[in-house]
Protein backbone atom coordinates (compact mmCIF):
# COMPACT_ATOMS: atom_id res chain seq x y z
CA UNK A 1 0.00 0.00 0.00
CA UNK A 2 1.57 3.25 -1.18
CA UNK A 3 -0.38 5.33 1.34
CA UNK A 4 0.21 4.87 5.07
CA UNK A 5 -3.18 4.11 6.60
CA UNK A 6 -3.88 4.54 10.32
CA UNK A 7 -6.69 3.02 12.37
CA UNK A 8 -7.97 6.54 13.05
CA UNK A 9 -8.37 6.99 9.30
CA UNK A 10 -10.27 3.70 8.96
CA UNK A 11 -12.48 4.77 11.88
CA UNK A 12 -13.21 8.04 10.08
CA UNK A 13 -14.26 6.16 6.94
CA UNK A 14 -16.40 3.83 9.05
CA UNK A 15 -18.28 6.86 10.36
CA UNK A 16 -19.39 7.33 6.77
CA UNK A 17 -20.46 3.66 6.53
CA UNK A 18 -22.54 3.94 9.73
CA UNK A 19 -24.13 7.12 8.46
CA UNK A 20 -24.94 5.68 5.02
CA UNK A 21 -26.54 2.56 6.54
CA UNK A 22 -28.55 4.79 8.89
CA UNK A 23 -30.07 6.99 6.20
CA UNK A 24 -30.70 4.07 3.86
CA UNK A 25 -32.81 2.39 6.56
CA UNK A 26 -34.35 5.74 7.51
CA UNK A 27 -35.45 6.57 3.98
CA UNK A 28 -36.80 3.09 3.15
CA UNK A 29 -38.86 3.01 6.37
CA UNK A 30 -40.15 6.52 5.71
CA UNK A 31 -41.07 5.44 2.18
CA UNK A 32 -42.94 2.46 3.64
CA UNK A 33 -44.76 4.75 6.07
CA UNK A 34 -45.95 6.92 3.18
CA UNK A 35 -48.72 4.46 2.26
CA UNK A 36 -50.30 5.01 5.68
CA UNK A 37 -50.00 8.80 5.32
CA UNK A 38 -51.46 8.69 1.81
CA UNK A 39 -54.56 6.94 3.14
CA UNK A 40 -55.00 9.65 5.75
CA UNK A 41 -54.79 12.31 3.01
CA UNK A 42 -57.34 10.75 0.63
CA UNK A 43 -60.40 12.64 2.02
CA UNK A 44 -58.65 15.98 1.36
CA UNK A 45 -57.30 14.90 -2.06
CA UNK A 46 -60.16 12.81 -3.43
CA UNK A 47 -60.03 14.49 -6.86
CA UNK A 48 -56.27 14.09 -7.30
CA UNK A 49 -54.52 11.16 -8.96
CA UNK A 50 -51.30 12.03 -7.15
CA UNK A 51 -50.50 13.65 -3.80
CA UNK A 52 -47.41 15.22 -2.27
CA UNK A 53 -46.93 11.93 -0.45
CA UNK A 54 -46.61 10.04 -3.72
CA UNK A 55 -43.94 12.46 -4.94
CA UNK A 56 -41.91 12.32 -1.73
CA UNK A 57 -42.31 8.56 -1.40
CA UNK A 58 -40.79 8.06 -4.84
CA UNK A 59 -37.58 9.95 -4.17
CA UNK A 60 -37.22 8.51 -0.64
CA UNK A 61 -37.06 5.02 -2.14
CA UNK A 62 -34.53 6.16 -4.75
CA UNK A 63 -32.41 7.82 -2.06
CA UNK A 64 -32.52 4.71 0.16
CA UNK A 65 -31.04 2.56 -2.60
CA UNK A 66 -28.47 5.18 -3.52
CA UNK A 67 -27.35 5.56 0.11
CA UNK A 68 -26.82 1.81 0.43
CA UNK A 69 -24.73 1.94 -2.74
CA UNK A 70 -22.69 4.72 -1.13
CA UNK A 71 -22.19 2.50 1.91
CA UNK A 72 -21.08 -0.34 -0.35
CA UNK A 73 -18.57 1.85 -2.18
CA UNK A 74 -17.02 3.08 1.09
CA UNK A 75 -16.92 -0.48 2.48
CA UNK A 76 -15.07 -1.63 -0.62
CA UNK A 77 -12.53 1.16 -0.20
CA UNK A 78 -12.01 0.29 3.48
CA UNK A 79 -11.33 -3.36 2.59
CA UNK A 80 -8.94 -2.30 -0.16
CA UNK A 81 -7.04 -0.16 2.37
CA UNK A 82 -6.68 -3.19 4.65
CA UNK A 83 -9.33 -2.24 7.19
CA UNK A 84 -12.56 -3.87 8.34
CA UNK A 85 -15.86 -2.18 7.52
CA UNK A 86 -18.30 -1.70 10.39
CA UNK A 87 -21.71 -3.37 10.59
CA UNK A 88 -23.00 -0.70 12.99
CA UNK A 89 -25.57 1.90 11.97
CA UNK A 90 -26.21 5.31 13.44
CA UNK A 91 -29.76 5.66 14.79
CA UNK A 92 -32.36 6.38 12.10
CA UNK A 93 -35.00 9.06 12.70
CA UNK A 94 -38.31 8.10 11.12
CA UNK A 95 -40.89 10.74 12.10
CA UNK A 96 -44.66 10.75 11.60
CA UNK A 97 -45.28 13.34 8.89
CA UNK A 98 -44.02 14.55 5.56
CA UNK A 99 -42.47 17.67 7.07
CA UNK A 100 -40.71 15.55 9.73
CA UNK A 101 -39.31 13.27 7.02
CA UNK A 102 -37.98 16.30 5.13
CA UNK A 103 -36.48 17.98 8.20
CA UNK A 104 -34.84 14.77 9.42
CA UNK A 105 -33.50 14.16 5.91
CA UNK A 106 -32.18 17.70 5.71
CA UNK A 107 -30.39 17.31 9.04
CA UNK A 108 -28.91 13.94 8.00
CA UNK A 109 -27.62 15.33 4.71
CA UNK A 110 -26.10 18.41 6.38
CA UNK A 111 -24.27 16.14 8.83
CA UNK A 112 -23.08 13.97 5.94
CA UNK A 113 -21.66 16.92 4.00
CA UNK A 114 -19.78 18.11 7.09
CA UNK A 115 -18.29 14.63 7.65
CA UNK A 116 -17.42 14.13 3.99
CA UNK A 117 -15.64 17.48 3.75
CA UNK A 118 -13.47 16.30 6.64
CA UNK A 119 -12.78 12.97 4.91
CA UNK A 120 -11.96 14.68 1.60
CA UNK A 121 -9.54 17.02 3.39
CA UNK A 122 -7.90 14.18 5.37
CA UNK A 123 -7.58 11.95 2.30
CA UNK A 124 -5.87 14.78 0.44
CA UNK A 125 -3.41 15.38 3.26
CA UNK A 126 -2.21 11.75 3.32
CA UNK A 127 -2.24 11.36 -0.45
CA UNK A 128 -5.13 8.89 -0.64
CA UNK A 129 -6.37 10.23 -3.95
CA UNK A 130 -8.77 7.38 -4.70
CA UNK A 131 -10.66 7.87 -1.44
CA UNK A 132 -10.75 11.62 -1.97
CA UNK A 133 -12.18 11.16 -5.47
CA UNK A 134 -14.77 8.66 -4.18
CA UNK A 135 -16.01 11.06 -1.50
CA UNK A 136 -16.04 14.01 -3.87
CA UNK A 137 -18.44 12.01 -6.05
CA UNK A 138 -20.58 10.97 -3.07
CA UNK A 139 -20.53 14.57 -1.79
CA UNK A 140 -22.08 15.80 -5.03
CA UNK A 141 -24.89 13.24 -4.78
CA UNK A 142 -25.55 14.02 -1.11
CA UNK A 143 -25.76 17.70 -1.99
CA UNK A 144 -28.54 16.90 -4.47
CA UNK A 145 -30.36 15.02 -1.69
CA UNK A 146 -29.99 18.09 0.54
CA UNK A 147 -31.52 20.37 -2.09
CA UNK A 148 -34.44 17.98 -2.59
CA UNK A 149 -35.22 17.88 1.14
CA UNK A 150 -35.00 21.68 1.26
CA UNK A 151 -37.89 21.82 -1.22
CA UNK A 152 -40.17 20.04 1.27
CA UNK A 153 -38.83 21.25 4.62
CA UNK A 154 -41.56 23.90 5.01
CA UNK A 155 -44.46 21.98 3.49
CA UNK A 156 -47.72 22.00 5.42
CA UNK A 157 -48.85 18.59 6.63
CA UNK A 158 -52.40 17.37 6.24
CA UNK A 159 -54.66 18.68 9.00
CA UNK A 160 -55.75 16.34 11.74
CA UNK A 161 -59.22 17.88 11.89
CA UNK A 162 -61.14 14.78 10.90
CA UNK A 163 -63.19 13.08 13.64
CA UNK A 164 -61.74 10.18 15.58
CA UNK A 165 -62.59 6.86 13.99
CA UNK A 166 -63.40 3.92 16.24
CA UNK A 167 -61.23 0.85 15.74
CA UNK A 168 -63.17 -1.73 13.73
CA UNK A 169 -63.66 -5.14 15.28
CA UNK A 170 -61.46 -6.92 12.73
CA UNK A 171 -58.52 -4.62 13.49
CA UNK A 172 -58.44 -5.69 17.13
CA UNK A 173 -56.42 -8.75 16.10
CA UNK A 174 -53.38 -6.49 15.76
CA UNK A 175 -51.82 -6.69 19.22
CA UNK A 176 -48.44 -5.61 20.59
CA UNK A 177 -47.28 -9.23 20.50
CA UNK A 178 -48.20 -9.45 16.82
CA UNK A 179 -46.34 -6.22 16.02
CA UNK A 180 -43.31 -7.59 17.89
CA UNK A 181 -43.41 -10.79 15.82
CA UNK A 182 -43.59 -8.84 12.55
CA UNK A 183 -40.76 -6.58 13.71
CA UNK A 184 -38.53 -9.64 14.08
CA UNK A 185 -38.83 -9.89 10.31
CA UNK A 186 -37.86 -6.22 9.93
CA UNK A 187 -34.79 -6.83 12.08
CA UNK A 188 -33.86 -9.95 10.10
CA UNK A 189 -34.15 -8.09 6.80
CA UNK A 190 -32.01 -5.18 8.00
CA UNK A 191 -29.40 -7.67 9.25
CA UNK A 192 -29.38 -9.44 5.88
CA UNK A 193 -29.07 -6.18 3.93
CA UNK A 194 -26.03 -5.09 5.94
CA UNK A 195 -24.45 -8.57 5.94
CA UNK A 196 -24.86 -9.17 2.21
CA UNK A 197 -23.70 -5.65 1.29
CA UNK A 198 -20.51 -6.00 3.34
CA UNK A 199 -19.84 -9.46 1.94
CA UNK A 200 -20.50 -8.26 -1.60
CA UNK A 201 -17.76 -5.66 -1.26
CA UNK A 202 -15.35 -8.00 0.53
CA UNK A 203 -15.92 -10.67 -2.12
CA UNK A 204 -15.36 -8.04 -4.79
CA UNK A 205 -11.92 -7.35 -3.31
CA UNK A 206 -11.13 -11.07 -3.05
CA UNK A 207 -12.08 -11.40 -6.72
CA UNK A 208 -9.24 -9.04 -7.63
CA UNK A 209 -6.68 -11.43 -6.21
CA UNK A 210 -4.81 -14.08 -8.16
CA UNK A 211 -6.52 -16.80 -10.16
CA UNK A 212 -5.49 -20.30 -9.07
CA UNK A 213 -6.85 -22.57 -11.80
CA UNK A 214 -6.69 -22.68 -15.59
CA UNK A 215 -10.46 -22.19 -15.77
CA UNK A 216 -10.26 -19.06 -13.65
CA UNK A 217 -7.53 -17.66 -15.89
CA UNK A 218 -9.50 -18.40 -19.08
CA UNK A 219 -12.81 -17.02 -17.78
CA UNK A 220 -11.15 -14.12 -15.93
CA UNK A 221 -13.40 -15.03 -13.02
CA UNK A 222 -13.26 -16.90 -9.74
CA UNK A 223 -15.59 -17.98 -6.95
CA UNK A 224 -15.44 -14.68 -5.02
CA UNK A 225 -16.44 -12.71 -8.13
CA UNK A 226 -19.43 -14.99 -8.74
CA UNK A 227 -20.47 -14.77 -5.08
CA UNK A 228 -20.06 -10.99 -5.10
CA UNK A 229 -22.40 -10.61 -8.06
CA UNK A 230 -24.96 -12.96 -6.50
CA UNK A 231 -24.90 -11.09 -3.17
CA UNK A 232 -25.59 -7.78 -4.90
CA UNK A 233 -28.68 -9.24 -6.57
CA UNK A 234 -29.93 -10.74 -3.32
CA UNK A 235 -29.39 -7.69 -1.11
CA UNK A 236 -31.58 -5.63 -3.48
CA UNK A 237 -34.35 -8.22 -3.06
CA UNK A 238 -33.95 -8.00 0.72
CA UNK A 239 -34.44 -4.22 0.45
CA UNK A 240 -37.79 -4.92 -1.21
CA UNK A 241 -38.70 -7.34 1.58
CA UNK A 242 -37.89 -4.72 4.22
CA UNK A 243 -40.08 -2.23 2.41
CA UNK A 244 -43.04 -4.63 2.16
CA UNK A 245 -42.90 -5.80 5.78
CA UNK A 246 -42.45 -2.34 7.30
CA UNK A 247 -45.21 -0.93 5.07
CA UNK A 248 -47.57 -3.63 6.34
CA UNK A 249 -46.70 -2.84 9.96
CA UNK A 250 -47.41 0.86 9.42
CA UNK A 251 -50.70 0.15 7.63
CA UNK A 252 -52.01 -1.86 10.59
CA UNK A 253 -51.03 1.01 12.92
CA UNK A 254 -47.80 -0.44 14.28
CA UNK A 255 -44.32 1.09 14.33
CA UNK A 256 -41.39 -0.57 12.58
CA UNK A 257 -38.10 -0.96 14.45
CA UNK A 258 -34.76 -0.18 12.83
CA UNK A 259 -32.10 -2.25 14.59
CA UNK A 260 -30.65 -5.42 13.00
CA UNK A 261 -31.08 -8.75 14.77
CA UNK A 262 -29.13 -10.97 14.63
CA UNK A 263 -25.95 -8.91 14.42
CA UNK A 264 -24.60 -9.20 10.85
CA UNK A 265 -21.76 -11.71 10.44
CA UNK A 266 -19.29 -11.27 7.59
CA UNK A 267 -16.71 -14.09 7.44
CA UNK A 268 -13.21 -14.20 5.98
CA UNK A 269 -13.73 -15.76 2.55
CA UNK A 270 -16.35 -16.76 0.00
CA UNK A 271 -17.08 -20.14 1.61
CA UNK A 272 -17.57 -18.51 5.00
CA UNK A 273 -19.93 -15.96 3.42
CA UNK A 274 -22.02 -18.73 1.89
CA UNK A 275 -22.28 -20.73 5.12
CA UNK A 276 -23.28 -17.66 7.13
CA UNK A 277 -25.79 -16.57 4.51
CA UNK A 278 -27.37 -20.00 4.14
CA UNK A 279 -27.88 -20.06 7.91
CA UNK A 280 -29.32 -16.52 7.83
CA UNK A 281 -31.82 -17.60 5.18
CA UNK A 282 -32.70 -20.72 7.17
CA UNK A 283 -33.38 -18.63 10.27
CA UNK A 284 -35.49 -16.18 8.26
CA UNK A 285 -37.55 -18.94 6.64
CA UNK A 286 -38.33 -20.53 10.01
CA UNK A 287 -39.37 -17.13 11.42
CA UNK A 288 -41.48 -16.22 8.40
CA UNK A 289 -43.33 -19.54 8.45
CA UNK A 290 -44.15 -18.84 12.10
CA UNK A 291 -45.52 -15.45 11.05
CA UNK A 292 -47.56 -17.09 8.28
CA UNK A 293 -49.06 -19.54 10.79
CA UNK A 294 -49.94 -16.74 13.21
CA UNK A 295 -51.42 -14.59 10.43
CA UNK A 296 -53.51 -17.56 9.32
CA UNK A 297 -54.73 -18.13 12.88
CA UNK A 298 -55.73 -14.47 13.21
CA UNK A 299 -57.28 -14.25 9.76
CA UNK A 300 -54.77 -11.59 8.60
CA UNK A 301 -54.85 -12.59 4.94
CA UNK A 302 -52.77 -9.69 3.59
CA UNK A 303 -49.85 -10.33 5.94
CA UNK A 304 -50.02 -14.08 5.31
CA UNK A 305 -49.86 -13.62 1.55
CA UNK A 306 -47.05 -11.08 1.83
CA UNK A 307 -44.90 -13.50 3.81
CA UNK A 308 -45.79 -16.46 1.62
CA UNK A 309 -44.38 -14.53 -1.35
CA UNK A 310 -41.29 -13.54 0.65
CA UNK A 311 -40.65 -17.11 1.80
CA UNK A 312 -40.63 -18.32 -1.80
CA UNK A 313 -37.83 -15.84 -2.56
CA UNK A 314 -35.95 -16.62 0.66
CA UNK A 315 -36.02 -20.33 -0.18
CA UNK A 316 -34.56 -19.50 -3.59
CA UNK A 317 -31.78 -17.56 -1.84
CA UNK A 318 -31.16 -20.49 0.51
CA UNK A 319 -30.71 -22.93 -2.38
CA UNK A 320 -28.47 -20.54 -4.31
CA UNK A 321 -26.13 -20.34 -1.33
CA UNK A 322 -26.38 -24.09 -0.76
CA UNK A 323 -25.50 -24.88 -4.39
CA UNK A 324 -22.04 -23.35 -3.95
CA UNK A 325 -21.34 -25.31 -0.75
CA UNK A 326 -21.95 -28.81 -2.09
How would you label these PLM feature ranges?
Residues 1-326:
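Iron-associated oxidoreductase/ferritin-like identity signal
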Amino acid sequence: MAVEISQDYINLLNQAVSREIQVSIQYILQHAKMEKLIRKSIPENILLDKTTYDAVGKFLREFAIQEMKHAAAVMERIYYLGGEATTMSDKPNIGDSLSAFAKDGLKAEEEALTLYRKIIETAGKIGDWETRELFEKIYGEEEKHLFKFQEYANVEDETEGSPTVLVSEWRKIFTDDYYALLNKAVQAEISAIIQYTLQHEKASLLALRGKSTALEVITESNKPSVVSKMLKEIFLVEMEHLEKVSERIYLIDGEAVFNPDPIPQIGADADAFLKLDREAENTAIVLYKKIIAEALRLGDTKTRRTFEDIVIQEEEHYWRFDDYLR
